[in-house]
């Protein structure tokens, strides 16, 4: 190597050493892959009778099991976000409940649990609706939950699965569990995720689908699509946030309202408003112009 080549090589080494720290400082670090949080299970049923069970365990591992057919007594365990084993659930048949019930001796009513597992479970235990193991002990009485399980908290699935489980246990005991659609059900399933915790959208992203798509294909999604928005129990009418004068002026019957809301549950805001004059658009109108009134109500706990 001659002297000219040597000087050029030294110059390049010095040039590299001078610029490397600057480039490294300006370059954005590669974002680390975040561990998934405990969630699920989401049971995705296919038309051919097969099923896919998706969940995340306590170590953040994605569990994705496929079943060629669904066993008649298929059951699974439900865990809270902090890893506590809560209760087992057995799948049962799902259909739309009647919109009108006879008044039982007692009716326990609450609303807006917003994925707060400890609060929701504590209320039901204090009201003698469930025992320490989350089993139905309310006899032939009725539990009414007026919507809004989604958003704000981290235990959406445990609350929905408990309601689903209690529905069958109450029926077997001569009682009833009623879950009504609230505005946060319509928001999340319509892909308005502004109040949805990151753990849920992160799981959907990992699976290559949107969060509403994950629900639409699931057992709980099918169950939600068959829930009513208005329910009459004896002389009491229950709805998430009241009924507007405009709604009353339209003289809808309750079964029609329940069907319209269910039909639009998994549609986006744009799809719901495609025909501005339609019943569908009216039912999903926002606060201040609301037809059915599925917006804004505080959590309550009432025993009648």
Model features per residue range: what roles?
Residues 1-27:
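Bacterial Sec-dependent N-terminal signal peptides
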Residues 23-304:
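Feature recognizes metal-dependent phosphohydrolase scaffolds
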